[in-house]
Amino acid sequence: MSWRSEHIWIDLITGSRKISNLCWAFTLFLGSLGFVLVGTYSYLGRNLISFFPLQQIIFFPQGIVMSFYGIAGLFISSYLWCTISWNVGSGYDLFNRKEGIVCIFRWGFPGINRRIFLRFLLKDIRSVRIEVEEGIYAGRVLYMDIRGHRAIPLTRTDENLTPGELEKKAAELAYFLRVPIEVF
């Protein structure tokens, strides 16, 4: 989502609060919980899960392995739920031609660098750069090239923009900032 006027352009960036992340976290939690329950019930020797006959799942080695995978899955699931609740990666890009500044803000993980805030002058921007990676994991990312700093990504790698949409966004941003476009 973006908002634009004659002198100001604001791009809102969605972070980890996406439907796909919620689905993965929920699915991983339920699957891991099932593995832990099967491992626990095989250790206790009880058949509390009716659709698995207990005689087929003995504690050593199947129950131990299922418990291990279940616990590992619960840790990964809790990591996903934490990133969703903290909304890691969300923020905004602010381009202000009137004041001549660019502000980039992102939420990070809790700690010292929870708030990532970058501020640059418009005159330090060299170009808007499009990088295209071909192959199995093809990706297109829009970068802002700044003097004295490394290139800053403006789109996420998992943001599936078509080549036309990415070119349009790059052209509009380059026109707004009055800088050239580079393609790599």
From Swiss-Prot:
The chain crosses the membrane at residues 19-39, 57-77. InterPro entries: PSI_Ycf4_assembly. One of its GO terms (biological process) is photosynthesis. Its main location: plastid. The keyword Transmembrane helix applies. GO terms for cellular component: photosystem I; plastid thylakoid membrane. It is a multi-pass membrane protein. Keywords: Membrane, Photosynthesis, Plastid, Thylakoid, Transmembrane, Transmembrane helix. It is found in: Plastid thylakoid membrane. Belongs to the Ycf4 family. HAMAP family: Ycf4. Seems to be required for the assembly of the photosystem I complex. This is Photosystem I assembly protein Ycf4. It comes from Cuscuta reflexa (Southern Asian dodder). The gene is ycf4.
